[in-house]
């Protein structure tokens, strides 16, 4: 019996190894790519459309059978070719304005990808979507079922659902670009992760976020959104997007430290190797050290960022040569901006300094960090709809300086829902002179902006903010252009003793409940 068991085990191992035959199998319709990995990975690419139509990993079919995995909603048609070059296989899909690459290294159960564009797709967004078997890969990581919409009832558009009493949306899977190096879908025996180490040609900056995954029932979607119109704050960039990698494993979560420098030897359009780049090093100073500091570089062609060390020192990622705007953030709040030039093969030295400047503070609600952190419902807003029963009451609320908790102040004001927001404070005789009420916002919807009344004085109505033409707060977004509004308060308006401020939402537009004109608070400060 023992000898038969050994023989069976040995035969099973031999079959696994035998199946791991690195190479390309070509038919009239498709290329079958065998990664030659110990845990066998084979995937099939259509020669007419560039769709991935099969992903067989460790003996299980992980690709959804109804629709392929592809760029956008599929290229429709493309010139597709595949070549084997030593330890690498490259599949190239060409259209007039886009080239998609799939690259495999011998022995690795990883599909490396890159997308080269010369113009934005007509749909106004650029994404890769892997449509995967939701029975074998039902789970979404790292945020769980907040974006599992299977069996739900649509409550807003076609992308926010009510599932078992909880609001869910694919948008609730998002993570800030600066923190999103990996997101996954998984099951008991398989895990597929998107590894993202290069955002240079994406759009939106370090704090932009977009859809990462969505189990809609028929299949579980694993995405990489390179750009979109989802609260987009800058023009889309063209060129090479990536490399990005789809990593297959049986259990453990893979490292994000993946070397893709071999792309330099594979004739990939737009790829710039490390020796064709430069860096920027320096020290940031002046901002509040209780927040993380971020330095961000961008121009029309590329974007980069890094957290600083605790002492403010930083070194950029390897950057393409060129002239860049350089921004310093306290949290997500811009405190300084300058410019810098990057040259090939060198490290440019550039320090940056800045801080939040106001005046003698009478009161401050929240922090100047570019986020609504700490305000009521802010801790839930990323992962659920404002109407969710798990949210606290939106109000209208009254915040009393000196006695209220920060959670007594709403993260957002919605016209006709919870406005006006009321602030009560006590002033001394020395504080009755001219003052400034500064209202920081992070995002506006439908032209919503604040108008303040201080006691009997009505502040002027500010002009409408830039329209980003995208739902925000209801889809888990809080960051837009970060408009800051100053209300100049004449001397004598503030009185010794009790004072009342109301902040209302004004807009020429209208909408129902949480789709009414609205804005999200960053910080409210009264100073002289």
Curated annotation (Swiss-Prot):
GO terms for biological process: cell wall organization; pectin catabolic process. Its EC number is 4.2.2.23. Keywords: Carbohydrate metabolism, Cell wall biogenesis/degradation, Disulfide bond, Lyase, Polysaccharide degradation, Secreted, Signal. Transmembrane segments: none annotated. GO terms for molecular function: carbohydrate binding; rhamnogalacturonan endolyase activity. It is found in: Secreted. It is an enzyme of class 4 (lyase). Disulfide bonds join 50-93, 184-193. GO terms for cellular component: extracellular region. Residues 1-20 form the signal peptide. It catalyses: Endotype eliminative cleavage of L-alpha-rhamnopyranosyl-(1->4)-alpha-D-galactopyranosyluronic acid bonds of rhamnogalacturonan I domains in ramified hairy regions of pectin leaving L-rhamnopyranose at the reducing end and 4-deoxy-4,5-unsaturated D-galactopyranosyluronic acid at the non-reducing end. Pectinolytic enzymes consist of four classes of enzymes: pectin lyase, polygalacturonase, pectin methylesterase and rhamnogalacturonase. Degrades the rhamnogalacturonan I (RG-I) backbone of pectin. Belongs to the polysaccharide lyase 4 family. This is Probable rhamnogalacturonate lyase A. It comes from Aspergillus oryzae (strain ATCC 42149 / RIB 40) (Yellow koji mold).
């Amino acid at each position: 019996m023992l000898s038969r068991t050994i023989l069976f085990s040995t035969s099973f191992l031999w079959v696994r190894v035998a199946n791991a035959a690195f190479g390309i199998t070509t038919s009239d319709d498709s290329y079958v790519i065998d990664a030659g990995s110990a845990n066998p990975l084979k995937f099939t690419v259509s020669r007419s459309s560039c769709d991935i139509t099969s992903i067989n990993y460790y003996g299980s079919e992980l690709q959804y059978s109804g629709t392929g995995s592809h760029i956008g909603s599929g290229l429709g048609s493309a010139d597709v070719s595949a070549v084997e070059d030593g330890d690498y296989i490259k599949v190239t899909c060409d259209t007039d304005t886009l080239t998609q690459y799939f690259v495999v290294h011998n022995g690795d159960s990883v599909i490396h990808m890159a997308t080269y564009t010369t113009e934005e797709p007509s749909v106004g967004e650029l994404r890769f979507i892997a449509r995967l078997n939701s029975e074998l890969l039902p789970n979404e990581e790292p945020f769980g079922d907040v974006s599992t919409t299977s069996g739900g009832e649509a409550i807003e558009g076609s992308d926010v659902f009510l599932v078992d009493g909880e609001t869910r949306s694919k948008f609730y899977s998002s993570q800030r670009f600066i923190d999103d190096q990996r997101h996954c879908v998984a099951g008991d025996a398989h895990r597929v992760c998107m590894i993202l180490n290069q955002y240079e040609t994406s759009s939106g900056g370090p704090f932009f976020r977009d859809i990462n995954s969505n189990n809609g029932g028929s299949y579980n979607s694993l995405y990489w959104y390179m750009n979109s119109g989802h609260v987009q704050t800058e023009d889309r960039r063209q060129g090479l997007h990536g490399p990005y990698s789809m990593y297959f494993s049986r259990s453990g979560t893979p490292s994000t430290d993946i070397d893709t420098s071999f792309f330099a030897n594979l004739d990939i359009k737009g790829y710039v190797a490390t020796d064709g780049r430069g860096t920027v090093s320096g020290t940031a100073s002046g901002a509040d050290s209780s927040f993380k500091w971020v330095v961000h570089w961008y121009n029309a062609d590329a974007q980069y960022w890094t957290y600083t060390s605790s002492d403010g020192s930083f070194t950029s990622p390897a950057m393409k040569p060129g002239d860049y705007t350089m921004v310093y953030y306290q949290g997500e709040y811009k405190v300084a901006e300058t410019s810098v030039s990057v040259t090939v093969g060198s490290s440019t030295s550039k320090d940056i300094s800045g801080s939040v400047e106001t005046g003698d503070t009478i009161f401050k609600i929240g922090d100047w960090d570019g986020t609504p952190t700490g305000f009521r419902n802010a801790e839930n807003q990323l992962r659920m709809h404002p109407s969710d029963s798990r949210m606290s009451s939106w109000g209208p609320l009254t915040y009393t300086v000196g006695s209220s908790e920060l959670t007594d102040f709403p993260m957002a004001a919605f016209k006709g829902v919870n406005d006006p927001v009321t602030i009560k404070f006590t002033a001394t005789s020395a504080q009755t002179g001219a003052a400034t009420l500064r209202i920081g916002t992070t995002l506006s919807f439908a032209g919503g902006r604040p108008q303040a009344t201080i006691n009997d004085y009505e502040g002027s109505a500010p002009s409408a903010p830039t329209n980003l033409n995208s739902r925000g707060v209801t889809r888990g977004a809080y960051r837009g252009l970060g408009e800051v509004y100053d209300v100049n308060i004449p001397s004598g308006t503030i009185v010794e003793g009790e004072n009342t401020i109301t902040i209302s939402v004004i807009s020429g537009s209208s909408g129902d409940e949480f789709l009414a004109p609205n804005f999200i608070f960053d910080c409210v400060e009264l100073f002289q």
